[in-house]
Amino acid sequence: MLHTVNKSPFEHKALETCLKFARQGSAVLLIEDGVYAAARDTAVSPQVQEALKSVSIYALKPDVEARGMQDRVMDGVRLVDYEGFVDLVAQHKAVQSWV
């Protein structure tokens, strides 16, 4: 399953809830303000690092760049462009949006 998170983890619980329900082998795509979860050395970094052990985490590159975060993305989080976003949707049978 592909999970999408578009809310900042510093203002909403969407990421926390998503990671509780994401099963091993799932993919999580951070979009819009959700990309703040991809930043290294933050309060949520340990939670994201732990999740990377069982799920793939992606961040939408245009959203990362729009927030000036391209040099702060933690290791293990993969950046994708819009084409990569479409590919992720096509690869998964279901998409769950956490809002």
Question: Which residues are covered by each model-predicted region?
Answer:
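Short, glycine-rich nucleotide/cofactor-binding loops
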Residues: 1-14, 34-40
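N-terminal phosphate-binding or glycine-rich loops at protein starts, especially the Walker A/P-loop
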Residues: 10-33
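Short, well-ordered alpha-helix to beta-strand connector turns
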Residues: 25, 54-55, 92-93
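Short, conserved loop/helix-junction motifs that constitute active-site signature segments
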Residues: 20-24, 47-53
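C-terminal structural segments of small proteins and small subunits
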Residues: 67-99
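Short internal beta-strands
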Residues: 27-32, 55-63
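Charged helix-capping and loop-helix junction motifs
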Residues: 41-47, 79
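Structural motif
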Residues: 5-8, 62, 99
